[in-house]
Amino acid sequence: MIKVNVLAVKYLASASPALCKQLGAPEGLPCLGLITTDCDDATYIALDEATKAAEVQVCYGRSFYGGASNASTPYAGEVLGILAAATPGAVRSGMDAVISALEHMGFEDVGVPCMAYTVSSCGSFLAAEAGVPMGSPIAYLIAPPIESMYAMDAALKAADVKLCKLYTPPTETNFGGGLLTGTQSACQAACGAFMDAVREIKE
């Protein structure tokens, strides 16, 4: 597994109302937690975990062009994620959950970096992204361009899952993939088929 490196974490105990509005933080949630890492997709999953562990919302999450290997500054990495909360304690609890989740996930290296991760019960962030109810299982699938589209077909055929969102390349990081939903076991089967298909590309 290619481990995720947390590059920077900062807190704003009472951010400017104008900044909060532009970032999409709901009114009444002025406390922000900012994080950058070198793996965007793992960070999005970890941000979602925070919404289940603490009274926080993900108000911002964007990947950077070219990916971590082309980062322009030491703390840029591949993604900026921002949590919003009503109190400094809540936003710190949420960020602790993000960092804890990142310690246990990352990209797989099967000749190319890729990710096939089953979220057993999604929080508010991924639920909104996938358009599914909170608590739904999600298969989060990401790989380089040709691998992602080839393997997505295999994942959809391998299990009784629904394609909720397709990320067609080029994305900011030039990868592709998508979010599937179904039962937890179906999502796990889809993840397995996705990884097997990614491996086939180099054969």
Where are these regions (language model features)?
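Short, conserved "active-site rim" segments that organize catalytic pockets and cofactor/ligand binding
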Residues: 44
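Flexible, small-/acidic-enriched active-site or ligand-binding loops
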Residues: 57
